[in-house]
């Protein structure tokens, strides 16, 4: 998709980019806009309630949220295997170690900051919030989480 050439410009309060067919409003291209800002998470750690579906899924079935995220981060590991391992580790209170490893992998892939603190601390103290943040980040990057890695990120067409 070759829509951008030239510099990003401010057009009033909206960010716009030039294309072959005129200026494109970046707010209309949110998945693309999110990818163009390396280092920043698209949602905060405590924004769990922004997506009620993800919040409820994570609250009642964290192994499903984790498995779906891990499948995409690992680019093909099965959702069931990762989710089951997460569940088994949660029975002894060690799921945060596995969550920490996946969060680190995800941050490396997408050049995200280790914020608000170290990955292990985030998963130890705020595990459900971390799972929601990671799941939502991948959604905003265009992944259809229920389909997993078989659905590559989709970008809006212009």
UniProtKB/Swiss-Prot annotation:
- Main localization is membrane
InterPro entries to which the protein is assigned, alphabetical? PLAC_motif_containing
Matches recorded under Pfam families: PLAC8 (PF04749)
Keyword set, alphabetical order: Membrane, Transmembrane, Transmembrane helix
Q: Does the keyword Transmembrane apply?
A: yes
Q: Which locations, inside or outside the cell, does it occupy?
A: Membrane
State the superkingdom: Eukaryota
The UniProt transmembrane annotation reads 49-67, 78-94
One GO CC annotation, please?
membrane
Q: Please verify whether the record's keywords include Transmembrane helix.
A: yes
Return the NCBIfam families for the record.
A_thal_Cys_rich (TIGR01571)
The Swiss-Prot or TrEMBL record describes its family as follows: Belongs to the cornifelin family.
Official protein name in the record: Cell number regulator 11
